[in-house]
């Protein structure tokens, strides 16, 4: 039966008239569908004419619902004549809660359609979010009315019980529907006021439940089933993080990690001045990435330190790693425990508190018997006990725990074949490390007071640490305890005091002051050699030594012009020095007779040595006279010998090979022992042997640095014993050097010390792009997942040599090349693609943390700026091999810049509480250049591959990358996700709509606090919903 549309009334009126006629004539659903289409033009939704509103209004006019109208409503939904959003919105407006039969009918209707709710147009998306929130609010209102009725009558009518049952079923369906939960999450951000009203309604229900004691169960009503209040709580307190998202690796935590030991080796050896709070932030970040508990993190840190100590025996870094493992690590654990509010308990025996996580960490460490057995045997002591005693000092554990844990270890250690405790180098080093804390405290206390009052005691303490490797030990302990800056400041102050003569000095005071000047100068020079001059210049002062080290000291990676040093000399001082040299009794006596200031002599020595060298070249001075002059310099002050050697080494770097022999002979003479009457007079000085020994070490280091340069005369090699050439740059091709380094790592499964320095040299010589390409090549050689994960961990740690530049090289050069170029790079296929995606994400997150901290992670002096300039200028990664360390780099696309934004603080790096995540993390995290530009380029490359409808391994790599980025970074990574091109996720969704693509993942990819983020998220989850429903309909 076709209806005549001759009347020119509005279509809304026509639809209402048609409803009345359909009811009178009892049309079937099909008849209704045929006739209604005569009014609705093709492609026009009934929502435009409020069709759903008209049908529901007629359906609930009486005391009971009209099922015929509800059948028309369902048919209109199935025929897509009206939207689910319009239906839910109209049902939520029904407020006649006393009509129980109508409520039951509407709830039954909802039960039948709720699982199929979706959107089929852009206009519906915005309506559905508010409609869903309104529907939940409506369900809560119904339940609240029933509770109020129960509070008044202490019982429920049968119809009210049916209403409660229907509400429970609908709520359960919503809770179990990921799409509706996603829509609710968007609606919560879209209309906060409505969601606040929802929360208030729930609070009222909770209070009524407590008052009345009425609890309605969902489902069968057994003891384990959910209650209606539980379902409401899940909806009202809904968070995006609660939505289901399939874990990247199945949520498993790796049983063994290979990243911490290389990371410790790199940071301790190449960045010894790193503060404790930087280690804390770095370790918490690693914990998040790996999913470790704090107990596991603490255990892996201690285990990594013990493995790193395995091959330090006899090396220059032995004291540094020992001090880090047994002094620094306890302080790191203490700060980690304090900053993260670690769990604490009271010891029953003593009443003292202790850290539960630290105790669990030691219990885990005791399970790693091979490492402990080997270190106990090598150290001839119980290394666990040494660590435990330090933990007790910091109140992380109690003496009771020490006894218990040592007792567990004792049966194993008793049967070990230990080295002789008096001859084991590591044993002696451990004893010295623990003993040096007290002398260091005494030195710092003396340096902080007036030097004129304690100069005798201060000189004795400083000279005491010059014997053997005591100075290295003191410096190592000072660096790991965070006292290095105080130590340097005190030495600078002491040196400035000692260089100034006072008229009131009598007796031995002038001699002590001169020795104090000499010792403090050389200790500072030794520090500048070992840790870089930047640690001295960081004080920002204008003292004598700071000026000397900045303008006169020869340094690795900081070339200084020898002729500029010569020109800065004062001619009057130079003239007087020449007169002292020509003194008939020798240079030593001449210097004693002069009234020159010591600092002026240091500034003028380069000019004096230059004139002497030129005279020797022209044969106008005999070698014997030169020997007497040099002996006089070093006999008077070892400082003068260091100044002379510094200029000579700088000079040798600038001249031809045939002009290097005479300057090197002069340097050798400075290192040689004194003889004759001059030696007897020299021995009368205070602590002359200790001062001379330190001077020899400093000068020999200068020689070794000169030998690293490619322009060294081959004849000079014969002047040095073989042990002095251990740091000479290898002449093997770079490929072979890298293969040797990787072989050493692969054989052990950890990073040896010498390999750490070799990889750092390769990074500086070849650039990050070359090194990262070689490392990734080793990753793709692996066949098994276990080997892949192990290799990825080691590569991730090695990239911390310079994490920012290596990350930029990986993301801007290597990954795009692998996506775009099929011939020259390995194919991105699973499982390699999965591990590569994990490496990329780890590097992005760590680089964000590193680049936004206030303090630089690595101190490389002016070499850093030189590297950045080269990176910006070069156009090819294939640069000529340059032997000067730090001057040959590969090209990256990164342009350095300082984007403004809030910087990461230590607190932002700590594990936040659940409430802190949503409010603080997103506002703190910002991206800076060059990482931001690099990611934008990478995402554009991703978009090129997802433009087609073909699911390829490379497209799946993009999905793995985004999935792990969301899982590992959470809200902190939102600034990265904002760079995703519009439509990228939707294009990926159309190709890869598998079970791995969930509503939870999609919502985490967008910032729901912005209108555009909510719009794109809603569009994507609706698309996913429709794809899933189409698949289900095909199965049917």
Curated annotation (Swiss-Prot):
One GO cellular component term: mediator complex
* Xref: InterPro entries: Mediator_Med24
Tell me where in or outside the cell this protein is found.
Nucleus
Pfam families given in the database record: Med24_N (PF11277)
Q: Which domain of life is it from?
A: Eukaryota
Coarsely, its chief localization is nucleus
Keyword Glycosyltransferase assigned to the entry: answer is no
Name the UniProt key words of this record, in alphabetical order: Activator, Nucleotide-binding, Nucleus, Repeat, Transcription, Transcription regulation
One of the entry's Gene Ontology molecular-function terms is: transcription coregulator activity
Give any single GO term for biological process. positive regulation of transcription initiation by RNA polymerase II
For this protein, the record's PANTHER family field holds: MEDIATOR OF RNA POLYMERASE II TRANSCRIPTION SUBUNIT 24
The similarity comment for this entry is: Belongs to the Mediator complex subunit 24 family.
Under the subunit heading, UniProt states: Component of the Mediator complex.
What does the record give as the function of this protein?
Answer: Component of the Mediator complex, a coactivator involved in the regulated transcription of nearly all RNA polymerase II-dependent genes. Mediator functions as a bridge to convey information from gene-specific regulatory proteins to the basal RNA polymerase II transcription machinery. Mediator is recruited to promoters by direct interactions with regulatory proteins and serves as a scaffold for the assembly of a functional preinitiation complex with RNA polymerase II and the general transcription factors.
Name of this protein: Mediator of RNA polymerase II transcription subunit 24
């Amino acid at each position: 039966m076709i209806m005549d549309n001759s009347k020119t009334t509005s279509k809304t009126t026509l639809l209402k008239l048609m409803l009345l006629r359909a009811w009178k004539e009892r049309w079937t659903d099909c008849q209704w569908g045929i006739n209604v289409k005569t009014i609705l033009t093709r492609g026009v939704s009934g929502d435009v004419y409020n069709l759903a509103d008209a049908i529901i209004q007629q359906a609930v006019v009486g005391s009971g619902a009209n099922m015929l109208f509800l059948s028309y409503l369902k048919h209109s939904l199935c025929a897509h004549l009206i939207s689910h959003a319009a239906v839910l919105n109209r049902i939520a407006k029904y407020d006649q809660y006393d009509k129980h039969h109508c409520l039951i009918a509407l709830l039954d209707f909802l039960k039948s359609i709720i699982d199929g709710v979706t959107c089929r147009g852009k206009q519906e998306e915005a309506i559905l979010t508010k409609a869903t929130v309104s529907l939940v609010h409506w369900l809560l209102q119904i339940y609240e009315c029933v509770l109020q009725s129960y509070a008044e009558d202490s019982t429920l009518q049968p119809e009210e019980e049916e209403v409660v049952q229907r509400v429970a079923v609908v709520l359960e369906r919503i809770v179990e529907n990921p799409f509706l939960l996603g829509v609710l999450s968007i609606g919560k951000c879209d209309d906060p006021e409505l969601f606040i009203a929802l929360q208030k309604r729930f609070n009222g229900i909770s209070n009524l439940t407590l008052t009345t004691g009425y609890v309605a169960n969902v489902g069968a009503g057994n003891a384990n089933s959910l209650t209606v209040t539980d379902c409401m709580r899940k909806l009202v307190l809904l968070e995006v993080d609660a939505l289901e998202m399939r874990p990247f690796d199945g949520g498993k935590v790796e049983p063994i990690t290979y990243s911490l030991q290389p990371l410790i080796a790199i940071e301790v050896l190449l960045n010894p001045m790193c503060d404790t709070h930087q280690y804390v932030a770095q370790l918490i970040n690693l914990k998040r990435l790996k999913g470790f508990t704090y107990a596991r993190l603490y255990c892996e840190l201690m285990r990594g330190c013990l493995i790193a100590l395995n091959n330090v025996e006899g090396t220059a870094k032995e004291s540094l790693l020992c001090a880090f493992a047994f002094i620094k690590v306890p302080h790191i654990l203490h700060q980690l425990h304090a900053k993260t509010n670690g769990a604490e308990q009271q010891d029953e025996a003593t009443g003292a508190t202790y850290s539960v996580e630290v105790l669990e960490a030691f219990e885990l460490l005791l399970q790693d018997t091979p490492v402990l057995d080997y270190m106990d045997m090598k150290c001839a002591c119980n290394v666990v006990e040494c660590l435990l005693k330090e933990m007790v000092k910091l109140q992380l554990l109690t003496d009771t725990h020490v006894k218990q844990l040592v007792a567990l270890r004792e049966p194993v250690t008793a049967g070990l074949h230990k080295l002789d405790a008096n001859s084991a180098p590591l044993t002696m080093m451990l004893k010295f490390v623990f003993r040096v804390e007290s002398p260091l405290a005494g030195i710092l206390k003396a340096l902080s007071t007036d030097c004129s009052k304690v100069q005798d005691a201060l000189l004795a303490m400083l000279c005491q640490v010059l014997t053997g490797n005591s100075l290295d030990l003191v410096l190592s302990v000072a660096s790991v305890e965070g006292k290095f800056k105080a130590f340097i400041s005190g030495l600078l102050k002491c040196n400035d005091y000692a260089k100034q003569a006072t008229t009131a000095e009598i007796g031995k005071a002038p001699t002590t002051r001169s020795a104090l000047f000499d010792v403090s100068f050389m200790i500072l020079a030794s520090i500048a050699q070992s840790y870089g001059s930047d640690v001295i210049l960081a004080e920002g002062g204008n003292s004598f030594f700071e000026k000397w080290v900045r303008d006169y000291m020869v340094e690795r990676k900081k070339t200084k012009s020898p002729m500029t040093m010569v020109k800065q000399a004062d001619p009057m001082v130079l003239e007087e020095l020449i007169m002292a040299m020509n003194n008939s009794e020798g240079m030593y006596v001449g210097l004693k007779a002069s009234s020159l200031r010591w600092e002026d002599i240091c500034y003028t020595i380069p000019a004096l040595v230059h004139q002497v060298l030129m005279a020797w070249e022209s044969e106008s001075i005999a070698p014997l006279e030169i020997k007497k002059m040099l002996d006089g310099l070093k006999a008077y002050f070892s400082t003068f010998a260091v100044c002379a050697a510094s200029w000579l080494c700088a000079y040798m770097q600038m001249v031809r090979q045939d002009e290097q022999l005479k300057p090197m002979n002069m340097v050798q003479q400075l290192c040689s022992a004194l003889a004759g009457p001059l030696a007897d007079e020299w021995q009368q000085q205070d602590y002359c042997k200790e001062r001379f020994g330190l001077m020899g070490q400093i000068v020999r280091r200068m020689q070794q640095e000169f030998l690293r340069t490619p322009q060294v005369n081959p004849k000079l090699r014969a002047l040095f014993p073989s042990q002095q050439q251990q740091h000479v740059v290898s002449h093997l091709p770079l490929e072979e050097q890298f293969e040797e380094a990787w072989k050493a790592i692969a054989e052990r499964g950890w990073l040896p010390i010498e390999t750490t320095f070799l990889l750092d040299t390769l990074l500086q010589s070849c650039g990050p792009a070359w090194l990262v390409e070689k490392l990734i090549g080793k990753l793709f050689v692996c066949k098994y997942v276990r080997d892949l994960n192990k290799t990825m961990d080691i590569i991730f740690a090695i990239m911390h040599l310079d994490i920012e530049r290596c990350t930029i090289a990986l993301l801007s050069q290597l990954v795009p090349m692998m996506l775009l170029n099929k011939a020259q790079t390995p194919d991105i296929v699973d499982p390699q693609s999965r591990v590569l995606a994990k490496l990329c994400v780890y590097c992005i997150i760590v680089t964000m943390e590193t680049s936004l901290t206030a303090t630089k992670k690595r101190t490389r002096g002016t070499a850093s700026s030189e590297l950045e300039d080269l990176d910006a200028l070069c156009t090819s990664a294939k640069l000529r091999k340059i032997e000067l360390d730090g001057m040959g780099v590969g090209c990256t696309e990164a342009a350095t810049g300082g984007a403004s934004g809030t910087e990461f603080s230590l607190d932002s790096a700590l594990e936040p509480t659940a409430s802190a995540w949503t409010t603080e993390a997103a506002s703190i995290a910002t991206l800076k250049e060059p990482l931001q530009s690099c990611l934008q380029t990478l995402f554009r490359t991703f978009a090129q591959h997802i433009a087609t409808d073909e699911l390829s391994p490379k497209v799946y790599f993009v999905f793995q990358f985004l999935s792990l980025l969301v899982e590992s970074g959470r809200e902190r990574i939102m600034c990265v996700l904002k760079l995703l091109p519009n439509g990228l996720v939707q294009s990926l969704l159309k190709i890869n709509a598998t079970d791995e693509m969930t509503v939870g993942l999609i919502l985490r990819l967008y910032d729901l606090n912005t209108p555009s983020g909510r719009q794109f998220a809603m569009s994507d989850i609706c698309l996913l919903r429709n794809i899933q429903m189409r698949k289900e309909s095909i199965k049917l």
